Amino acid sequence: MQARYRTDYAGEFVILETRWTGGRKTQTREWVSNPIENHHISGRAACIGSAFDADRFNHVRLQRHRGGLLGSKKLQTYGVGDIASTMRLDFAVETRVSQLATLKESGYTEKNIVYTTARQCLAHPGEFYLLPHSPGLLDIAVLPYLAAFDGHQEIFMLGYNRETAVENATWSQQVRNVVDAYPGVKFYFVGEPSNMYEAWLEPANTQAMTYREFIGYCDV
């Protein structure tokens, strides 16, 4: 996986139609400009992959997080669609058709950013935002990719552990691939350290952190 950054991203072409004529393929493409300029003070983000640890830490608290003096510790929040159903996120990621419909019908997309695939953006013009560079990752792994893409230097991973319910078993390796692609970014896996995948904690740019430590460190 290659590290990419929003500062270098002007936009990308999206394929609208593909045709085969006389054995030759032709495509109709449309340029989609980058619609987001993400300005953040602290360089910190929280990626909420699931509500698994909600009994230990109510992630909804982050919706009101101010980050201490002058917002120096404020966290931008990234979360999957299920989390977006419970709180306002700075950036949500959802690719499931059923959950996208739920977010749209609830009015969530009117005032909030929801990233999804090019196919779903074309199917629902003006409702969703295009995932930059189509990373080909599961939603839960897209979160840290986007946070690093946006230039955050410290990323706190909440709801990521061995018991996180994800249908595709490759998800933990995808998370590791993101970590490896951004060696200059510090990834904190928040929760019970013994419940984390060992492969996540092998790189020098990762660290396990309890919720008590997270609350103190981020002034939550």
Feature map (PLM): residue ranges:
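Metal-ion/cofactor- or nucleotide/acyl-coenzyme-handling active-site neighborhoods
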Residues: 1-220
